[in-house]
Design a protein with these regions (language model features):
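Domain-scale signature associated with acetyltransferase and cell-envelope carbohydrate enzymes
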Residues: 1-115, 139-141, 148-150, 158, ...
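HATPase_c (GHKL) ATP-binding subdomain of two-component histidine kinases
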Residues: 170
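Short cationic/low-complexity microdomains
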Residues: 152-164
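A short acidic, glycine-rich active-site loop
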Residues: 64-71, 123-136
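A generic "structured core" feature
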Residues: 143, 161, 166-167, 175
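Acceptor-binding helix/loop patch of EC 2.4 sugar-transfer enzymes
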Residues: 111-126
Length: 191
């Protein structure tokens, strides 16, 4: 029965991606329910894998993946990327390279979503439009551990690893392991 549900959800999700004006490469595989709000540009490379909710990944529990691309924003996801029960909130520019793995329950966002000014934040008409937005880049072969938060304006370098439960608030150079809240340097990766 589970296999039938997975096949059906996969077919339904491919239709959902097509009708959301997402450009995607071959071998798209999305298992479980995924939320999509696409107002800007969104492109996804070949061999994209998304495990969403308890039907597909025990670590994701019953949390569905969600991808939001705001008006005039751009989300670009490379080839061979895998995500699990992940939220990607793009209001400006998010670029995810090739061969990136994103652990369950991770949040990637390029915006504060709300104004940091309490006067603007208290008014629904001025709140979101005054939120600070800065691009995010996750480079090739990066690995983001489960339950991490990737904040606006950061770059995670090639081959770098973010430990589980980390909050990334500043750039991570290539070939390094970072972790914690806020994430700090742990060690170099020797290739």
């Amino acid at each position: 029965m589970i296999l039938i549900c997975r096949k059906f959800s996969g077919f339904f999700n491919i239709l959902k991606f097509k009708y959301s004006n997402i450009k995607f490469g071959s071998h798209l595989r999305v298992v479980g329910k995924i939320g999509l709000t696409i107002q800007g540009r969104c492109s996804i490379g070949a061999n994209f894998r998304c495990s969403s909710g308890d039907m597909s990944n025990a670590m994701g529990r019953n949390v569905s993946s969600y991808i939001k691309v705001g008006e005039n924003a751009s989300l670009s996801i490379g080839d061979n990327v895998g995500i699990s029960s992940t939220c990607i909130w793009c209001d400006k520019d998010i670029r995810i390279g090739n061969n990136v793995k994103v652990g369950a329950l991770t949040i990637i966002t390029d915006t504060d979503a709300h104004s940091l000014n309490p006067t603007l934040r208290s008014n629904n008409e001025t709140d979101g439009i005054n939120a600070v937005k800065k691009p995010v880049e996750i480079c090739d072969n990066a690995f983001i551990g489960t339950s991490s938060v990737i904040c606006k304006g950061v770059r995670i370098g090639c081959n770098s690893i973010v430990g589980a439960g980390s909050v990334v608030t500043r750039n991570i150079p290539d070939n390094e392991i970072w972790g914690g809240n806020p994430a700090v340097f742990i060690k170099k990766i020797v290739l």
